[in-house]
Design a protein with these regions (language model features):
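Short, hydrophobic beta-strand segments
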Residues: 103-108, 304-311, 354-360
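Short Gly/Ser/Thr- and Asp/Glu-enriched loop/turn motifs at secondary-structure junctions
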Residues: 98-102, 139-142, 281-285, 336-340
Length: 420
């Protein structure tokens, strides 16, 4: 059996842990530069606030309903996530981190009769140890466990855990579960399935195996089998290497000068390269994109991207930053105000499988030692202590007017408790 621990409204819940007076009050968390909503409490959802809702469109609601608004505080959220995972790993044989607010639990070998109470015990313990409310879904496969965790969120009477393993119970749930909410059903397949009158997960599993394989390939067939209780997605104690690494930011205001955008893109390339090295990988493609503010329809609109390739796959910041600059030069156009830029590293492979080029002019062993030294220095003394000159020395400016304290990672911002 597999479990799925899903933190409820995670970013909003993190803010509430240190502000208990916000319990019962609408809470939203905004994206970088306070652009749009990326997390909502249940009270905020009830007001009709959507994911991705531009902040300026909800300011009237904010005043009328006393919404607590927060800028994204990823240092806090990352640390709270680590605390949740640490707690989980003390109670189950293994936990696989799936995202910042989700983890799969290995429950194989535990008696079925104990699972529901174990799930509730996990939910209570995580809440007590971290302050974060979680929903535990338990089922024979990862895909069904994801569905069970969604049910747990919808029905408070389940008391933090939903066990779903009997065929009749699974059928009852799948008959009502929308196909677009099934884990593993992407946007392209979603449209195709709906056009074929596949509205629910039950409609999906009733289709013949050949029909699924012909239209959705091996990935779709795996989901089809998982929904029928056949485990096809292995448990991974260590997270797999990412196949794409993206770093992007919205700017606090529109940028018009190439030099300003170049500095930001260089910083993005440096951050992406560090993430690449952290997972012991190399990339064979670098894509840079820039776009204007789509919410300012009165302004000229422009979006473009460009992909370039290194001579050989690399994780070297000193190669990736110039490649990103080359891509940016090809797509930058004067006369536009750019609101966002980003970089994506793709065609990712393992560092151990590198095929060297006999005529490669780069001393890769020397550069690898340099990158290791730079990463070690930044880990020890703080991010961006050592940087490439192209990214400048000033930190990236972001508009974060509603930023909370870093209660758990900065001694200067640690919470103060007063007692009479």
């Amino acid at each position: 059996m597999y479990g799925l621990c899903d933190c409820n409204n995670f970013f909003a819940s993190c803010e509430r842990v240190f502000r208990p007076e916000l319990e019962g009050r609408p809470v939203v968390v905004l994206s970088n530069n306070d652009g749009c909503v990326i997390a909502r409490s249940n009270e905020a959802k009830a007001l009709g606030i959507r994911m991705g809702h531009p902040y300026f469109q909800i300011r009237d609601l904010e005043k009328r309903h006393g919404i607590a608004v927060f800028s994204s505080n990823f240092n806090l959220y990352g640390d709270m996530s680590r605390r949740v995972i640490w707690t989980l790993r003390r109670m189950v044989p293994a936990a696989e981190v799936y995202s910042i607010d989700e983890a799969f639990l290995d429950l194989r070998g535990i008696e079925t009769g104990r699972l529901e109470e174990l799930g509730r015990h996990i939910s209570r313990t995580v809440r007590r140890n971290t302050g974060i409310p979680v929903s535990i879904g338990i089922a024979p496969t990862k895909t069904l466990a994801k569905i069970a965790s969604k049910l747990c969120k919808e029905y408070p009477k389940l008391q933090g855990a939903c066990l779903m393993y009997r065929p009749q119970d699974i059928e009852k749930v799948l008959r009502k579960f929308p196909i677009e909410d099934v884990w593993g059903i992407g946007r392209k397949h979603r449209r195709m399935l709906q056009a074929a009158s596949v509205r629910t997960a039950w409609d999906f599993v009733q289709r013949p195996e050949a029909w699924i394989r012909g239209r959705m390939g091996v990935t779709g067939l795996r989901t089809w089998k998982e929904l029928q209780g056949e485990a096809c997605i292995d448990f991974e104690s260590a997270p797999p290497a990412k196949q794409q690494i993206t770093v992007s930011r919205s700017f606090a205001h529109e940028l018009t000068q190439y030099e300003e955008i170049h500095t930001s893109v260089a910083a993005f390339a440096s951050m992406a390269a560090e993430k690449l090295r952290r997972q012991q990988s190399l990339c064979g493609e670098v894509t840079v994109y820039i776009l204007t503010n789509r919410h300012r329809e009165e302004l000229p609109q422009y979006f473009e991207s460009q992909t370039v390739r290194p001579v050989v796959p690399t994780d070297n910041t000193l190669e990736l930053v110039p490649l990103a600059a080359k891509a940016l030069q090809r797509i930058f156009r004067k006369g536009y105000g750019y609101k966002k830029a980003g970089i994506t590293l793709s065609d990712i492979s393992s560092r151990t499988g590198l095929q060297t080029d006999l005529f490669d002019p780069v001393d890769r062993a020397r550069h690898a030692r340099l990158m290791d030294a730079m990463d070690a220095t930044n880990r020890t003394y703080g991010r961006n202590r050592v940087v490439v000159a192209a990214q400048g020395f000033a930190p990236l400016k972001m508009n974060r007017q509603h930023l909370s304290q870093e209660y758990t990672t900065d001694w200067k911002q640690i919470i103060t408790v007063k007692a009479d």
